[in-house]
Amino acid sequence: MSIIDNRKATHDYFIEDRYEAGMVLEGWEVKAIRDGRVQLKESYVIVRDGEIYLLGMHVSPLPTASTHIRPDATRTRKLLLKAEEIRKLIGKVEQRGYTLVPLNLHYKNGRIKLDFALGRGKKLYDKRDTAREKDWQREKERVLKHDTRVNQRDS
């Protein structure tokens, strides 16, 4: 079950490989995420010291958050992957033009997981081509739907 999607990711990047990772979260973060108080829009994934981290994910603390800690809404969160996957990702990210983009947060067996992808940034003309292609597909479906209705009415 998806908690939140980063719809901007497919608009701004060509998605190549998808990965799923666990996250190191604090108790107040889990409660806030379950309440839907999370945003992935400006977040990104980085590789630092052989480990992978999620930066910029905003988790708004609940008003009933613990009083003995100070919630940091945009703290850096470590992603949990197998060592082999991390090595493979480091090799791919070091290639020019590739980056790691968070796609969505979801539950898996009661745990909160992050789907992220290896992506290449789209240029402005790529975004226009993608939009043009989507419009064309929509138009084709509309015309086909209209034609089938006309044919059914005639017979």
UniProtKB/Swiss-Prot annotation:
Where does the protein end up? Cytoplasm
Please tell me whether the keyword RNA-binding is annotated for this protein: yes
A GO CC term assigned to this protein in UniProt = cytosol
Q: Which domain of life is it from?
A: Bacteria
Identify the keywords attached in UniProt to this record, alphabetized: Cytoplasm, RNA-binding
Q: Which residues form a coiled coil?
A: none
Q: Name one Pfam family in it.
A: SmpB
Q: Which GO terms describe its biological process?
A: trans-translation
Which InterPro entries has this protein been placed in? SmpB (IPR023620), SsrA-bd_prot (IPR000037), SsrA-bd_prot_CS (IPR020081)
Question: Does RNA-binding count among this protein's keywords?
Answer: yes
The entry lists its GO molecular-function terms as: RNA binding
- Say where the protein is mainly found: cytoplasm
Disulphide-bridged cysteine pairs: none
Give the similarity note.
Answer: Belongs to the SmpB family.
- Recorded protein name is SsrA-binding protein
The organism of origin for this protein: Bordetella pertussis (strain Tohama I / ATCC BAA-589 / NCTC 13251)
